[in-house]
UniProtKB/Swiss-Prot annotation:
It is an enzyme of class 1 (oxidoreductase). Catalyzes the reversible oxidation of malate to oxaloacetate. NAD(+) binds at residues 8-13, 32, 94, 117-119. This is Malate dehydrogenase.
Length: 307
């Protein structure tokens, strides 16, 4: 049985713990700097187990020592972007938070696999890797599974079909410069361009790129957490079960797509060792151009942090 630690007991972190607990993967630790928050949510989740029928031990804590010997650590800590806050402000604030988190992971869970969910995702995942000193394959970010899920949901709505029959593909940076790939997106094996006209696909791609912002606008306060937590658990299961799933992942590049030394959303094989292989797809020229712009944005972010 595995030991899993989730750093951050906000909506994303707590919902992730709930989904994981229902799968009974082993012991789960949820930690947060706010006293009482992880303890209260852990107690609530333990009581839910008596109703939903799971026996997972969930522990809430403010002490990083409790993550000792974790097999998997999921980082959901940090702040969300607030009105008037620039992306650079968000990056600097969250890099400090995740720097502290990562130092504690290195101290107490030096053999763990680390999944980062904190934004700006690709830059912060780089911060986590550099600060822990872990191998690049053992630290990666969750973004593409969420983005692909949003794309698939919009396609299903447009076609009035089951989401179960859609395999959507999104790569690139997590944010405005993500790259949904219609040519690699299928509905029961049928390429999307054979089912929808170009202008409709373009509209769905644009909605996917703005998918997180759409939810923020509707909520007025806070951001998405149901779909993000579902995506996190999908990625976590690939590691815990060593299933070798091929999923969109923010992985460290070593020459793929002409990029090196940054984290970037690509297709990757995930297993017990983390990122076990990065797969490179043939893209259209305009998609390569968006990838280049996205990579430059990530590189500028890393440079500004002076890492």
């Amino acid at each position: 049985m595995a030991k899993i630690s989730v750093i951050g007991a906000g909506n994303v972190g707590a919902t992730t713990v709930q989904r994981l607990a229902e799968l009974e993967p082993g012991e789960i630790v949820m930690t947060d700097i706010v006293e009482g928050l992880p303890q209260g949510k852990a107690l609530d989740l333990m009581q839910a187990g008596a109703i939903n029928g799971y026996d997972t031990q969930v522990t809430g804590t403010n002490d990083y020592a409790d993550i000792t010997d974790s097999d998997l650590v999921i980082i959901t800590a940090g702040i969300a972007r607030k009105p008037g806050m620039t992306r650079e402000d968000l990056m600097k604030t969250n890099s400090k938070i995740i720097g502290e988190v990562s130092r504690n992971i290195a101290e107490y869970a030096p053999n763990s696999i680390v999944i980062n969910v904190t934004n700006p995702l690709d830059v912060i995942t780089y911060v986590a890797m550099k600060t822990t000193g872990f191998e690049t394959k053992k630290v990666f970010g969750m973004s593409g599974v969420l983005d692909a899920g949003r794309f698939a949901s919009f396609i299903a709505e447009e076609l009035n079909c089951s989401k179960k029959d859609i395999e959507a593909m999104v790569i690139g940076g997590h944010g405005d410069l993500m790259v949904p790939l219609p040519q690699y997106t299928t509905v029961s094996g049928i390429p999307l361009p054979e089912l929808l006209p170009e202008e409709t696909i373009a509209r769905l791609v644009e909605r996917t790129v703005n998918g997180g912002a759409e939810i923020v606008g509707l909520l007025k306060q806070g951001s998405a957490f149901y779909a993000p937590s579902a995506a996190i658990v999908s990625v976590a299961e690939a590691v815990l079960k060593d299933s070798k799933r091929i999923l969109p992942t923010s992985a460290y590049l070593e020459g793929q797509y002409g990029q090196e030394g940054i984290y970037f959303g690509v297709l990757a094989k995930l297993g017990a060792n983390g990122v076990e292989e990065v797969l490179e797809l043939k893209l259209e020229e305009n998609q390569y151009e968006i990838l280049r712009k996205s990579s430059e944005t990530i590189k500028r972010g890393i440079s500004k942090l002076g890492i």
